[in-house]
Each structure stands twice: as C-alpha cells, then as structure tokens.
A protein has these predicted regions:
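Conserved catalytic or regulatory cores that recognize and/or transform ribose-phosphate-containing ligands
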Residues: 1-124
C-alpha cells in the first residue's frame, strides 16, 4: 500500500515539535512527511526567527509550502498551545478550499501525551 503524504503546517517557533511529530507520523503511521526546514543557529547569518523574511524569500517559501499541500493527502497542523499564526491560518484555508483533510495536534491525544511526557522528562 502506498504511504500517505502528510504536510506539516505550523509556526516556525514549533520547529522542534514539528520534527518530533514528523518522526512519530513516519514511525507510527508509515507516512511520508513534509514541512518547513530550518537552518541551525550555527549556520552563518541565521537570525533567531523568520529566516525567510530576513533573506527576503518569505513569499517564495509560502508559495512553495502551498505546493507541498497540493502534493499531500492531508495536512497536520502543529497548533501547540492552540497557537495558529497568520501563515498557518492561510495554509489551513488553502487546504479546506482544495479538499485536503486536516488534522490538528491538539486533537491527537496520543501525540499530545508523548510531547508533554517528553518535555517533562527533559526538565527533570
């Protein structure tokens, strides 16, 4: 059976959670995941937030992300702390307009539990 393709959508402030969810979806559901990719802080000239804006390519990256949604069987919204930013809201609307099913992290108790447990373990 062909694996489903999942496009991860969410704020770059949740890139760490996005990476964990990508791993869990691939491990537990056999899905292929696509999402945003951030450069590490040690990469020359990387600002703390919004690299695409700093490099003047935000519009290009936003458009590319919509193409990822076009390829996806569903989107998975990383709405940690119930936060959905402007870009993510546009991606959700785009998915709705194009009939792409939408899942939300906050509605996925097994993944929420995993993230909460992992965060708690990291603090101990």
């Amino acid at each position: 059976m062909k694996p489903k393709i999942v496009c991860l959508c969410g704020s770059s402030r949740f890139a760490d959670i996005m990476a964990v969810i990508a791993w869990l979806l691939e491990r537990d559901e056999g899905a292929i995941t696509m999402g945003l990719h951030l450069l590490p802080q040690w990469y020359p000239g990387v600002p703390k937030h919004h690299l695409a804006e700093a490099e003047g390519v935000a519009e290009q990256m936003d458009e590319l992300h919509l193409r990822k949604i076009d390829l996806a069987d569903e989107i998975f919204v990383i709405d940690w702390t119930d936060y959905i930013g402007e870009s993510t809201a546009k991606e959700i609307q785009y998915a709705k307009d194009n009939g792409v099913p939408i899942r939300y992290l906050t509605h996925e108790s097994k993944y929420i539990g995993f993230i909460c447990d992992a965060e708690q373990g990291a603090k101990e």
